[in-house]
Amino acid sequence: MKAGKCWGQTEFIHGNGVLEFHRIEFKKDHRCSKHMHRTKYNGFYVEEGKLLIRVWQDDQGLIDETILQEGDFSVVSPGKYHEFVGLRDGVAFELYWAQFNHSDIVRENSGGKV
C-alpha cells in the first residue's frame, strides 16, 4: 500500500519483528521531517535520483551530510536525528532493522556433497 507524504510517497513492502522494507519515491527540493529512531538502524539505497542524508548528534549539532546517487547506500545509527532531502526526483529503498549477532548459527552437521 502506498502512502502520500509531503516529500513524495512511501510503499511498505515487508516487515517482521526485526526488519522493515519500504520503497520511497522522493521529490526534488522536498525533505522528510527531522527525526530519530531509538532502537532501529535506518538504511537508504538509492535506485535512481539523488538524495541528501543529514545526521545530527545532540551534543555536536549537524555532524554529517552524505549525498547518495544511483547505487549508493548509507546507514543512520539508532539515536541520531536525521532527515533526507531530494536533490533530484528519484526512488530509494528504505530499510529499518535491529542489530543482531551474525555468529548466532548452531550447526547440527556440515554441508557438502551428497
Identify the meaning behind each predicted range:
Residues 1-23, 31-34, 66-70, 109-114:
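A short, N-terminal "cap"/entry segment at the start of jelly-roll beta-barrel domains
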Residues 3, 85-114:
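Double-stranded beta-helix
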Residues 24-40, 44:
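Short, well-structured hydrophobic secondary-structure segments
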Residues 30, 39-40, 80, 88, ...:
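A generic "binding-loop/recognition-motif" signal
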Residues 39-58:
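Glycine- and acidic-residue-biased ligand/ion/polar-headgroup-sensing regions
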Residues 57-79:
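Short acidic-glycine-tyrosine-enriched beta hairpin
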